[in-house]
Amino acid sequence: MIIVDTGFWLALANEQDNHHQQAQLVIQRLREPLITTWCVFTETCYLLLTCLGNHAQLLFIQNFLAGGFEVFELQSNHVRRMDQLMDRYEDIPMDLADASLVVLAENLGHGRILTSDRRDFSIYRWQDNHTFQNLFLEYP
């Protein structure tokens, strides 16, 4: 499963986004299931609504309902870990959605991610010392 961040979803939906063509190429070529978190899902819906309108938000939700990707269920122990991560990276600062993706990586046992956030995900570490592999911006 490949982890997906908000920036990838936005690039995929927005034809004016600098990374739109790259996002389309990646989504056409990848053959692995995609997974995100409810924090990212919510952030994506909000940004799609405010930047592109209700139709874009509804298409995203319908993609989920059609099985286009999975959403990881966070438990209270995951939220505790997110709190620790947000404290650790307070100088960046780390937001809730990013913290949830680090927790997701820790649960999956890998950091293969689709994100346009090169800076932050080059700093974040899952299980405190493993780096993320950005499959979006590094895709051939």
Task: Give the positions of each predicted feature.
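Short, well-structured N-terminal submotif of metal-dependent ribonuclease cores
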Residues: 1-36, 49-61, 139-140
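Alpha-helix/helix-capping structural signal
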Residues: 7-8, 39, 77, 119
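Structured helix-beta-strand junction loops
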Residues: 29-33, 67, 92
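Short, hinge-like loop/turn segments at secondary-structure boundaries
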Residues: 51-55, 90, 129-133
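Active-site neighborhoods of divalent-metal-dependent phosphate/nucleic-acid chemistry enzymes
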Residues: 71-116
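Acidic, PIN/NYN-like endoribonuclease modules and their adjacent C-terminal/linker elements
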Residues: 109-140
